[in-house]
Amino acid sequence: MFMLKSLGKYIWGNTNSTEIVQIPYGQLYSVHENYRECMFKDASASIRRTTAEFQYQLVIQRAYEEGEEELEDDGDEAEDEQSFLLDEKLHLRFDVNKDSITIMWDNPDFQDGTLYEFTCENCLQEGVAYTFEMVALQCMYERKYRQSHEKATLADLEQFSNPITRPSKEVDSLENIVTKLDLESEDLMRLKKQEQLDDEIAKKYLLGQQEAEEPLVQQQTSIVNPEKEEVTKTENIKSLEGELMGTISAELHLFDAVEEVFILQDPNVEASVFDLGDWNYWFTISTEEKTWLSQSVDADMNPVFSFEHLSFIWNYFDANSNAFSWLLRFDSQVRMEQFQELLMRALWESLNQQRWLKIDDEQRDYVMETFHEDEELEDSEDEEFARQQLLSRKEEEEEEDEEASDFEDSFADFSDGEADDLDESRWRKEAAKEHNSLLAVGYKNDRSYVVRNNKIGVFKHVDEKGLKFQTALNNLSTPKGKSLRPSKLMLHNQDSSILFQTENAPHSLYHMDIEYGKIVDEWKVHDDVPLVTFTPDNKFAQMTAEQTLIGLSNNSIFRIDPRVEGNKLVAEQFKQYATKNDFSSAATTENGYIAVASNKGDIRLFDRIGVNAKTALPALGEAIIGVDVTASGDFVLATCKTYILLIDTRIKEGRYAGRLGFERNFAKDKKPKPKRLQLSPQHIAMMQRELKGGASFTPAKFNTGIDAKETTIVSSIGPFLISWNLDRVKRGFTDSYKIRRYDANVQAEDFRFGTDRSLIVALPDDVAMVDKSSLRRPTRESICTPVKKLRSKHDIVNAPY
């Protein structure tokens, strides 16, 4: 608790600052005898000096997100800030951990037992929580004894610290009546880890009891599991504790992966959702006689709602990670809408850990519409035009399948020259036990760069369908000889340089001269600002001599200029935000507009650094791991683990119709509805052997080029390379994707610059150039058949590159 006391001079040193220490994000609650009220859902806590000697204040200040409208008619600024004189009469209580803190204190305005509580969970840098507690105790010591805290012993400070004692009875905060079923073990839900709980309940409750239904289930199991694992009979759910959120009747169908159709299992089942507490939710399908399945509500369900067919499709994974695709069909749109809100409420609360009913109607509609099987993104066309589009789409797919039937990928070849052979031999020998991890495609020099441990392989693009190993940049290291392994990579300065970051140096960027083949600079960004990610100043900046780039920390955006003396962060172009935004990725348009995504799942659109976002799009729940944007800024791609979002940023109506969301904000009820790209639950059921272990999409990308139109989106998941036709996606055909399966997981992929026909694909031990026409519609054949490899004269199929 007091391990940071020796740092007191550093913490207290700046007497010109009123603020001594701060926790930048958390929530403030008012705790009463029978309920707990959230006062500020986003807040910061700080300890400030006052003008009086030995007097300090604990200050809780509300924070606003960009795009959040403040109530102008209140006129009460005091509501946005609560301050308390740090005195022992507050009876401060602390619960401090490495990365979290909870503080409780008496409400000085009431004597009825009302308390305040400030909580920040699992998001602080190590030491911040302990520092805050120590400073608070030192302030109370100074007030009581009217002398400097430097004279205090640890025992002197401990008298002001009290532990937090929770009431034995949980407070029910305006929730529905809890429905409890009989328990075999009352503590089962609380004591088991969620993964273990999933497996145990899945084993007991997934499959049917009736003898007549066993052949069908065994047939499905044999499709997805060649070992023909024996299916055990199950009993009804005998124990489940939780709040019954709702139950809806429907038909139940199971996907047959051999026939590629859904087969009716039961004409009348009850689909129920339970709230188990602690943001855990449970989904069951049952009748009076049996329980069909029981599973946790999470993103791996891959939920798809089709209002055209009044159906809901999702995935269930058993204890052995075998995937099953199930379908519920409803008898009316009303019932389906009721079920959708029921399930989406549970899923959203699970991912966001806040109450669905506390967000506004517009945000709830935004979330639910994103999970619909899509309509058109653009203005509707007439019926005849739509019919012709469908016919054209079908004909084009058939033509592409015919073209793809005999296609073989062109894997990288090595050169004949003596010097090149030496490079190849050294590369293969030194890198034989390592695997590819990162890919960067050149815009100007027609080359691709592939990272493998502390080496970078350079591959030249040959003709339209070939790659040729050119050289290896070996033994990446600092001037002092410290080995470096890139974790993020970017080409820079007309493709003459590579900038990269390593995981163990979050405050630095390394600058490599490609021609020289050595690291020439280490750029210290800032001692107190860790670099989460970085991106070019604009879409095509790497083709120019532009020196600056854009950097992100968890809650700030700034410019990096290597020409600045000392730290490379430009102080005049640094914007820090009050709340914990948890930024994760960024991309820029041709004009330098910036799209920024976060691990919370929200997206912000900026026209420049140093201002609040023009548009803030709500989070769906999953963390965003990558973002891309078209050169014009019309469309943004945001990649999550189980789906990809396509967002049209063009404002469609009103005063700013025709402008971009980067330039003007959308009306509150007119925010763009994302198109949700994902694998269909049916295809996941057929791919399940390859997607075991929680496979994730790689960051999706548009094709790009000077004056080129973006027409295609590419990503991958596990061993499957996947592409979407952008025009078809805009017209609502989000399930119209093409795939190509490899015999190893795809590590990274991107388009060759200036074309949408050629793709560069990095596998663990190979690099290939792929013709887009080789990707095929997902069928049992295309899903189960890996790509044939063309062996080079050096027979490098299983060797590095």
UniProtKB/Swiss-Prot annotation:
Signal peptide: none
Keyword Cytoplasm in record: yes
Modified residues (Phosphoserine): S405, S415
GO cellular component: cytoplasm; cytosol; nuclear envelope; nucleus
Keyword DNA repair appears in the UniProt entry: no
Protein's cellular compartments: Cytoplasm
Entry keywords, A to Z: Cytoplasm, Phosphoprotein
Gene3D superfamilies: YVTN repeat-like/Quinoprotein amine dehydrogenase
Modified residues (Phosphothreonine): T478
SUPFAM superfamilies on file: YVTN repeat-like/Quinoprotein amine dehydrogenase
Biased composition (Acidic residues): 372-384, 396-423
Family annotation (InterPro entries): Quino_amine_DH_bsu, Vid27, VID27_C, Vid27_N, Vid27_PH, WD40/YVTN_repeat-like_dom_sf
Region ranges (Disordered): 372-427
Family: Belongs to the VID27 family.
Physiological role: Has a role in the negative regulation of gluconeogenesis. Required for vacuolar catabolite degradation of fructose-1,6-bisphosphatase (FBPase).
Protein name, as recorded: Vacuolar import and degradation protein 27
Organism from which the protein derives: Schizosaccharomyces pombe (strain 972 / ATCC 24843)
Higher taxonomy: Eukaryota, Fungi, Dikarya, Ascomycota, Taphrinomycotina
Primary gene name: vid27
